């Protein structure tokens, strides 16, 4: 489900909030990549990919932090992300299975979904936000986020032995589309 374009108007009323929330999204994405390395060291290609994603996400964090500083704003404290919590709850209620492969697939689909939604939000911001600097900033970020979500899906397919990953992804997408009906009303990256 596409984000309602009116979300950008909400964001424009509080640029500080979207930038702070975005910075922490990047930090959490980097932390998630590190967790994947620690949990799945038996997959050298995944370790290499997660290491690269971690570096890139921290570069994005630094870029967002720089945008805050340029505007005389501070990072502030981390915000809770109800969207991420809702996705996590869906997966915890056994939407694939509890085998090691099922847990792995869930983690990959979870990361892919967050990256895909972030990419979609970056696209909207790159097309519609009035601030030309932020428009270009989000256009650049959108391209890397698209690569990230496909990376996670690729690993789910490669190492999710015995699981119909495409079916699980379609079901997760359907859930997320319903979930998004209650989002898009706050000046946060997923809100």
List each language-model region with its residue ranges.
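Non-heme di-metal
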Residues: 1-191
């Amino acid at each position: 489900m596409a984000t309602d374009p009116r979300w950008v108007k909400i964001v424009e009323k509080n640029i500080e909030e979207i930038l702070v929330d975005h910075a922490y999204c990047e930090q959490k994405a980097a932390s998630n990549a590190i967790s994947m390395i620690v949990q799945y060291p038996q997959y050298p290609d995944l370790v290499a990919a997660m290491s690269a994603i971690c570096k890139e996400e921290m570069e994005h964090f630094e870029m967002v932090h720089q945008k805050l500083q340029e505007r005389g704003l501070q990072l502030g404290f981390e915000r809770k992300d109800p969207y991420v919590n809702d996705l996590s709850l869906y997966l915890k209620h056994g939407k694939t299975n509890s085998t090691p492969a099922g847990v792995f697939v869930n983690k990959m689909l979870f990361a892919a979904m967050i990256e895909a939604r972030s990419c979609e939000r970056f696209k909207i911001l790159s097309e519609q936000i009035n601030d030309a600097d932020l428009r270009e900033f989000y256009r650049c970020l959108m391209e890397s986020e698209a690569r990230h979500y496909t990376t996670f899906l690729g690993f789910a397919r490669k190492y999710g032995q015995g699981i119909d990953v495409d079916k699980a992804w379609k079901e997760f997408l359907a859930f997320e589309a319903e979930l998004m009906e209650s989002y898009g009303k706050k000046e946060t990256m997923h809100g």
